[in-house]
Amino acid sequence: RSGPAELSHILKDSGAQAWVGAAPDTQYPEVPQLPVLPVRLHARDWHHVPEPSPRRTAFVLYTSGTTGAPKGVLLSRGAIAAGIDALAEAWDWTDRDTLVHGLPLFHVHGLVLGLLGPLRVGSRLIHTGTPTPEAYARARGTLYFGVPTVWSRIVQDEESARALSGARLLVSGSAPLPVPVFEKLRELTGLTPIERYGMS
């Protein structure tokens, strides 16, 4: 969750003009006040809108872990589609899969792969809210996404880790997975975790 200084920078740098959906629940005086465009979740789409060019920007995602203020990275529709399609082919990710994760939806891992990926591939998605070992174990998925912190917690709960042995793929991203965690995860699940790097 971004603090007030980072949120203010991102809104100003991106040229954001409105909140889509609900306004943020925390108001900071230094954060620009923007109009709210509510989203009616029950409404049907009756507009026909032409398909935008693959070169059009789909997202401006802000980097993390950099020195200085976060930097906005423009991701095109075509780049996002190509990235998802390449991983779907490499991982044999299909509409028969159930993806499980509890990652935040403001990074490439959670948003692009964890939300847009299942929509593009047609697979089922279970978002656990919080990525706890117990939530991952209960979900009974075929693919699991996590970051090193999530996997570190999972290997500390051996019963939950063993419950993931029915999956076909464990994916770690966003930072390097420590070797001891990698090895313990492989030992407890019988699966070799796959590491991936983000687009931003």
Role assignments for model-derived ranges:
Residues 24, 78, 149-152, 175-176:
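Alpha-helix/helix-capping structural signal
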Residues 81-98, 106-142, 157-158:
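Conserved AMP-binding/adenylation subdomain of ANL enzymes
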Residues 58-85:
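Conserved AMP-binding A3 loop
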Residues 57, 63-66, 99, 105, ...:
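Conserved S/T- and glycine-rich ATP-binding loop of Class I adenylate-forming
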Residues 1-50:
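Structural core segment of the AMP-binding/adenylate-forming
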Residues 44-62, 69, 92-98:
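Conserved pre-ATP/AMP-binding loop-to-beta segment of ANL
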Residues 141-146, 155-200:
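Gly/Ser/Thr-rich phosphate-binding loop
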Residues 1-18, 71-74, 101, 123-130, ...:
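Short beta-strand->loop structural element characteristic of the AMP-binding/adenylate-forming
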